[in-house]
Amino acid sequence: MAITKLDVGIKENSYSVANNSSNITVSATITWSWGTWNAEGSAYGYLTIDGTKYNFSGITFNVSGADRGSETVMTKTVDVYHASDGSKTVSVSAFFHGTNTNEITGSGSLALTNIPR
């Protein structure tokens, strides 16, 4: 199996004027080009969200009989805090390693809602 891409998605779910923060969900989705894969809990990776690292282990899913496809392998929902002027661009990076597959990384960023101050 060859993993060809790791896409990072960032969604702003809500924001709080009182806390000067946003609630976001980050996801990492792999795309593969060929092969069969049974992770059986041996895949692992991490998301780094706004400088904080979140580890994922025991990632399990099966890919069988597909020439290509994609699967979301990591998801995390967190609160991030804005600058004193209410602005915030959140940066995210991701790493994934599966059984008998290559390691792959991805990254992304999103300008969040400017919170009125």
Language-model features and meaning:
Residues 1-117:
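Mature extracytoplasmic or otherwise solvent-exposed domains
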